Amino acid sequence: MSLDLQYISQDPQHLPERPASTEGFFLENHGESIFGTVLIPGGAAVDVYPGIVLLHGFPGYTSTFDLAQNLRRAGLVVVSPYYRGCWGSGGRYTFSGAIDDAVRTASWMHEESTAKTYHVDRDKLFFIGHSMGGFISVNATRRLSWIKGTAVMSPYDLAGRAEAGDAALDQLIRESVPVMNVESAEALAADAKMCEKKVGPFRTPLKT
């Protein structure tokens, strides 16, 4: 199926054979449940669409559901996972864990049974990430050779932020900790420093 950008800001014609739908999903990752939504365009029973793993920013205050709806209108299947430790998913939130959750979600989307259920073209899978979700998207892409592309919006460069000092990240963590399940603000800051060393800043090429 081709994209139809005229429908980004308006609903397409109702298709009674298979109307557009929104479904919940959950996955197991390291013994904890990841929850999220799948938005599926309406169409014929045999239609398949490119798939998007849409990754939200640092948990607690913002959602990308409006963007997911616009992408679905244009003809994309949009999977939006909620990382462990936030928005109802089990476990504790860490930056490294969020990358792992993104990889787990994309791998699930790439499975034949999932693609069949949600009308996904397995050969056309992409990441889109906003803010911290951009950082997560880039680093999840590095681990999955079959991802076709990645788009980021206002990405937060967690690995490169050391050049600006720790104050901004410390403030970000302490503002968000009350609405997440974390071990502690200090543990999350330590995980961020581990990510700095392990994944590298955005200026590092995705592929060499």
Residue ranges of each PLM-predicted region?
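Structural cue for short, hydrophobic secondary-structure segments
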Residues: 54-57, 80
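The alpha/beta-hydrolase serine catalytic core
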Residues: 13, 24, 146-208
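Short glycine-enriched nucleophile-adjacent loop
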Residues: 134-144
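Alpha/beta-hydrolase active-site loop
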Residues: 93-118
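N-terminal cap/lid segment of alpha/beta-hydrolase-fold proteins
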Residues: 2-47
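Active-site glycine-rich loops that stabilize anionic/oxyanionic intermediates
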Residues: 49, 56-60
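Conserved alpha/beta-hydrolase
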Residues: 68, 72-88
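Alpha/beta-hydrolase fold nucleophile elbow
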Residues: 117-131
